[in-house]
């Protein structure tokens, strides 16, 4: 079979695709069902709770998983790799418990927070803070070792548990707190399974080693927190400036942008842990070509997600959620630029210039939030437009400085053609919403981007099997 002849990298990406769709796509899978039981206001509160959890998890986690990509990834000896990641895992658990305890005390002492969330909500949130960093390192280690099949099994088990529990909650007591609790329990289940699967040993590498790791990851954590202002904080602004119902509609649109990001993750999960190793041992040409393939993949997904999402909302959700269609194009553009920022940010991280990354994120985030305040009088589109502009600026600035530090041989003419075509298709999809037009726009956009990639030989890096030769052999054999 042709699939058996695919490179192992592509096989792993396909396996990761299924795994990530199961783990992170569950919210989208369950959306039609949840929309029948929950109002936009309830979905808005659930989104607010999830957003706060993500922010605090970033704070408490100290970006310790980034050390795996940077330091473990450069080691050749497998024993050294395992010893290093065991030290990293131990550090992550201890730091999460220490910092998480402090954050927990602060949260329970904040009266404004208690007016929005219940005490049980806060307790569940604090539970997540204690294990999220260790969970991230455990999952990253499986990807680093290319144990895609183990990753898939864990994903299936956790998804079955989560879906079953959510359905029970929806039919018995459709309360936001209980739905959130299911997610927390699922995370704990994953951590237990992963701890046994990876077999990490408790290993303390000393304060000097910890200081070295934190010097690298702490600026990244700050940078990520600042960047959160463009990838999550807008939900706080929407909930405060407009209404919790409006936030619920925005959350529905954002779930489809998340779906696009989920479909990008198989490539990211395969490539991100290996990019520095590839740059070091396989060269700039290989690194640039793989990155360009990722760009094409992201662009095609953006066009497809914008069209499919419009059809899904109008066909599968109650009429109360139809206004979310008008927000789809904006949130897809935001997600597009955010993913491109992560994809092209190679040189800055490779040269360990995390302070520079922090400065860039601070400038772009402050500019974006300033625009949000200035343009909020134009409604929710003023906020979406501000975030999209800030994300696009951030992507361009990161690419510029990354190239100055490590100049990769990107084919910028081809990349610009693909970007212009992608943004044009997204604009057309916003104007022409009839299903036939959406399908035609999607097909044209995908074919054009693939044609450019073929013309500039982006895909040659993967050594794909020659399907035409397979077809000829099949015909001769018959």
Question: Where does each model-flagged region fall?
Answer:
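Alpha-helical transmembrane segments of multi-pass membrane transport and lipid-handling proteins
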Residues: 66, 87-115, 124, 167-171, ...
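Hydrophobic transmembrane helix module of multi-pass membrane transport proteins
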Residues: 90-224
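Signature of the first transmembrane helix
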Residues: 8-65, 163, 218-244, 442-446
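Interhelical loop/hinge segments that connect adjacent transmembrane helices in multipass membrane
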Residues: 1-5, 9, 149, 153, ...
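Membrane-interface junctions at transmembrane-helix termini in multi-pass inner-membrane proteins
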Residues: 131-153, 332-363, 402-404
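Helix-loop junctions and terminal segments of transmembrane helices
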Residues: 60-77, 257-295, 345-350
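Transmembrane helical elements of multi-pass membrane transporters/channels
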Residues: 12-27, 158, 178-194, 207-276, ...
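Membrane-proximal transmembrane or re-entrant/amphipathic helices at the cytosolic face
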Residues: 2-3, 429-478
């Amino acid at each position: 079979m042709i699939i058996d002849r695919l490179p192992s990298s592509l096989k792993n990406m396909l396996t990761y695709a299924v795994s990530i769709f199961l783990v992170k796509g569950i919210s989208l899978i369950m959306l039609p069902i949840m929309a029948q039981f929950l109002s936009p206001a309830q979905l808005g509160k659930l989104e607010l709770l999830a957003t706060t959890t993500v922010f605090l998890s970033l704070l408490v986690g100290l970006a310790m998983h980034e050390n795996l990509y940077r330091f473990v990834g450069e080691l050749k000896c497998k024993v050294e790799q395992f010893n290093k990641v065991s030290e990293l895992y131990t550090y992550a658990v201890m730091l999460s418990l220490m910092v998480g305890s402090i954050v927990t005390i602060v949260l329970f002492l904040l009266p404004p927070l208690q007016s929005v969330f219940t005490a049980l909500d806060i307790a569940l949130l604090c539970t997540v803070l204690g294990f999220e960093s260790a969970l991230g390192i455990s999952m990253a280690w499986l990807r680093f070792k290319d144990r895609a099949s183990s990753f898939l099994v864990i994903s299936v088990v956790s998804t079955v548990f989560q879906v079953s529990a959510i359905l029970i909650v929806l039919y018995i007591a459709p309360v936001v707190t209980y739905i959130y609790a299911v997610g927390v329990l699922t995370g704990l289940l994953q951590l237990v399974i992963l701890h046994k699967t990876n077999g990490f040993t408790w290993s303390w590498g000393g304060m000097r080693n910890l200081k070295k790791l934190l010097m690298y990851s702490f600026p990244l954590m700050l940078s990520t927190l600042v960047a959160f202002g463009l990838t999550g904080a807008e939900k706080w602004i929407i909930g405060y400036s407009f209404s919790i119902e409006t936030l619920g509609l925005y959350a529905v649109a954002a779930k489809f942008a998340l779906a696009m990001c989920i479909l990008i993750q198989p490539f990211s999960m395969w490539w991100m842990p290996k990019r520095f190793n590839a740059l070091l041992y396989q060269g700039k040409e290989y690194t640039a070509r793989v990155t360009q393939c990722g760009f094409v993949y992201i662009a095609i997904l953006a066009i497809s997600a914008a069209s499919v999402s419009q059809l899904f909302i109008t066909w599968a959700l109650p009429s109360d959620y139809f206004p979310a269609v008008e927000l789809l194009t904006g949130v897809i553009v935001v997600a597009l630029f955010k993913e491109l920022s992560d994809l092209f940010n190679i040189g800055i991280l490779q040269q360990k210039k995390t302070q520079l990354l922090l400065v860039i994120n601070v400038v772009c985030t402050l500019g974006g939030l300033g625009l949000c305040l200035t343009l909020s009088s134009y409604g929710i589109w003023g906020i979406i437009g501000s975030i999209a502009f800030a994300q696009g600026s951030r992507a361009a600035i990161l690419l510029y400085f990354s190239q100055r530090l490590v100049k990769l041989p990107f084919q910028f003419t081809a990349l610009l053609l693909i970007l212009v075509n992608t943004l044009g298709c997204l604009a057309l999809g916003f104007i022409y919403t009839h299903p036939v037009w959406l399908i035609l726009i999607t097909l044209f956009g995908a074919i054009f981007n693939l044609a450019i990639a073929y013309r500039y030989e982006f895909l040659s890096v993967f050594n794909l099997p020659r399907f035409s030769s397979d077809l000829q052999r099949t015909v001769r054999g018959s």
